[in-house]
Amino acid sequence: MVDTLACNTPSFTKLNLVSFAHLRQFEVADCSFVYVKEVRMIGLKWLESVVIGENCFTMKDSRSQLHLKDCERLRELRIGNHSFEYNPSWVIVNLPSLEEIEVGEWRENDYRSESALIVKSKRLIMRLTTRPAQLEIVVVR
């Protein structure tokens, strides 16, 4: 687990987890990686869970990217409020075991929850495109 307020050095702008071949869980506490504008989790065949706290990966840059691809055992993806908020490109592809995606926090009868996304399914096939922010999430099974 990455602690709260960790990895916030301005020169640390890319996070590539490809070399962590046996990573099973990636968990980040709140307010971490604030200067990172590119995240790559590709080909991590043992990865089962990605949980990101609030206000992480908040760098404002039109070239920011999140790549989550080819992780055959990944079951859950949870991203806290305001994390990746300014990240215009999300590529989430080829995750055959994915059962749950949660982005933001949804509270019943709370108007601030309108930006939350929660998808739970045994068989998840989804394409979501939100053009104003040019956010794209693609999960193909």
Residue ranges and their predicted role:
Residues 12, 23, 33-36, 47, ...:
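Conserved hydrophobic position(s) of the canonical leucine-rich repeat
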